[in-house]
């Protein structure tokens, strides 16, 4: 990212990483190396969670937060049958904000999280 003069770096771990200690250690190492290459980086560490996982995502988030020190979350698949009620418990339990939500598969379907609009959509959902 630095050599290509990029402002944003996304690292996809392909999920279920928290169940494998070796992979979690490797992810910690990646974070340390990024900090050495670019002092002060990473500037934010966000965990992307699938809203359809429900309350199971809280235990997953806790493990990632312990390992990496998260700054917040991105909740995906909020366009399906899942209403994303886990958002409230997740944010309360870890005291971290939801930054973005995914409501589809296209880049424009990734939206900045607006708590008021989210609650309104939950309450007035048909």
Residue ranges and their predicted role:
Residues 1-126:
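P-loop/Walker A NTP-binding module and the surrounding RecA-like catalytic core of P-loop NTPases
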């Amino acid at each position: 990212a630095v050599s290509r003069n990029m402002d944003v770096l996304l690292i996809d771990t392909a999920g279920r990483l928290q169940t494998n200690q070796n992979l979690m250690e490797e992810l910690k190492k990646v974070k340390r190396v990024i900090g050495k290459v670019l002092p002060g980086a990473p500037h934010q560490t966000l965990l992307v969670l699938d809203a359809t996982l429900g309350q199971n995502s809280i235990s997953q988030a806790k493990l990632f937060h312990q390992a990496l020190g998260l700054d917040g979350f991105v909740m995906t698949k909020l366009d399906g049958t899942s209403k994303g009620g886990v958002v409230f418990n997740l944010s309360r339990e870890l005291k971290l904000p939801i930054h973005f939500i995914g409501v589809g598969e296209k880049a424009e379907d990734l939206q900045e999280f607006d708590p008021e609009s989210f609650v309104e959509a939950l309450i007035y959902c048909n």
